[in-house]
Amino acid sequence: MIDSLERKDDMKVLMVNGSPHREGCTYTALKEVAGALEKYGIESEIFWVGNGEIAGCIGCGACAKTGEGCFRKDVVNEFVAKAGEADGYIFGSPVHYAAASGALTSFMDRAFYSGGSKMTGKPAAAVV
């Protein structure tokens, strides 16, 4: 299917590595995707969630009210700042006990809520 695509030299895909291992299997899978995108002129960047604690969303709504991101100053705000520049997203995660990594799940909950219109309507995919 990807062979039928035309070149898109002005597109950018922001990929999220949800593994606690910076250059583990999830990174390797995302690098393969990046290589395929590059063949079609699509720029990509891999954003590593990291192996530090990412607290879950508490639903306070402060990020939506202020527009300044989550009050928890961590990698979620860094991602949301980059999210507006991306045309699409790919989320990668190892599978831990039949689910995505806990860090990625908390990350996505907060990123989607605080990212608001920066992410709305843009295509996304998952690599597991």
Feature names for model-found ranges:
Residues 1-10:
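Short, Lys/Arg-enriched N-terminal segments with co-localized hydrophobic residues
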Residues 11-42:
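N-terminal beta1-alpha1 ligand-phosphate binding loop
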Residues 28-31, 59-62, 103-107:
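Short, glycine/charged-enriched secondary-structure capping and boundary segments
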Residues 42-52:
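A short beta-strand-loop structural module common to alpha/beta enzyme folds
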Residues 52-80:
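Cysteine-cluster motifs in flexible loop/terminal segments that predominantly coordinate metals
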Residues 71-128:
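Helix-loop-strand module that forms the ligand-binding subsite of alpha/beta enzymes
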